[in-house]
A protein has these predicted regions:
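Major-groove DNA-recognition helix of helix-turn-helix-type DNA-binding domains
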Residues: 30-65
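General helical structural elements
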Residues: 24-27, 39, 58, 83, ...
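Polyanion-binding surface elements
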Residues: 2, 7-44, 73-74, 78
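A short, Lys/Arg-enriched interface patch at domain edges and termini
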Residues: 65-88
Length: 88
């Protein structure tokens, strides 16, 4: 009988940036912004900052959310590209 379980323990499986969810502390470390600034950017569509993904069906304030790593990295790269266009 074959098993459909992964051959590695789940904590050692690496996820692609497009599927990996990260919590706000990791977002803060990547973009160098404070939590309130991140949420402010999310409320401003023109900022282009990625929206969080709800991790539960809860509508309560403080319900768990996460961001898609690739979207955060794309936003960061876009900020760098914007800087480079201005400098050129």
């Amino acid at each position: 009988m074959t098993s459909s379980l992964p051959s590695k323990p789940i904590h050692t499986i690496e996820l692609a940036p497009a599927t990996r969810l990260i919590r706000v502390t990791e977002v803060m470390a990547i973009v160098g912004l404070a939590r309130p600034t991140i949420y402010k950017l999310m409320s401003q569509p023109e900022s282009g900052f990625p929206q969080a993904v709800k991790l539960t069906d809860s509508t309560a304030r403080g319900a768990p959310v996460a961001w898609v790593l690739s979207e955060v990295l794309d936003w960061t790269h876009a900020r760098i590209a914007a800087r480079d266009r201005v400098a050129a």
